Amino acid sequence: MKLDLKILDARMRDQLPAYATTGSAGLDLRACLDEALTLKPGETALVPTGLAIHVGDAGYAALILPRSGLGHKHGIVLGNLVGLIDSDYQGQLMISTWNRGETTFVLNPMERLAQLVIVPVVQAEFNIVDDFETSDRGAGGFGSTGKH
């Protein structure tokens, strides 16, 4: 699929989102910072990417997801857990960054911070009913299908 990409910061021309391998699902997004950003434990920051996208097709959306290494090794995850980019959004991609770790983390300019994944979207239509057809699970919720 083709995705319209607008470069908002000239430095990003040489740092375009890219798939790390042929099997990668996510495009790496970088922190478009002028200087290093220090995040103390528990702090959050909204980090610019220097890029804007326009998916343009209501059958798709983009997700901003954390990079697994940053989360596991340093406790750096997304403040909103997942960023949903609707197909009609055209503004700069911003990364809500949260240091859930126990030590201070320094984010350097142009460091890979998150990943962008394009996903198909189906918009649902509601069918109002008085009752549901019986299923094996019924209304069983959290933990209702067993311990393991």
From Swiss-Prot:
Alphabetized Gene3D superfamilies for the sequence: 2.70.40.10
CDD domains: trimeric_dUTPase (cd07557)
GO annotation terms (biological process): dUMP biosynthetic process; dUTP catabolic process
NCBIfam families: dut, PRK00601.1
Descriptive protein name: Deoxyuridine 5'-triphosphate nucleotidohydrolase
Keyword Magnesium: yes
Record-listed substrate binding positions: 67-69, 80, 84-86, 94
Keywords attached to this entry: Hydrolase, Magnesium, Metal-binding, Nucleotide metabolism
Enzyme Commission code: 3.6.1.23
Function in brief: This enzyme is involved in nucleotide metabolism: it produces dUMP, the immediate precursor of thymidine nucleotides and it decreases the intracellular concentration of dUTP so that uracil cannot be incorporated into DNA.
Reactions it catalyzes: dUTP + H2O = dUMP + diphosphate + H(+)
Family: Belongs to the dUTPase family.
Cofactors (names): Mg(2+)
Annotated metabolic or biological route of this protein: Pyrimidine metabolism; dUMP biosynthesis; dUMP from dCTP (dUTP route): step 2/2
GO molecular function, one term: magnesium ion binding
Pfam families: dUTPase
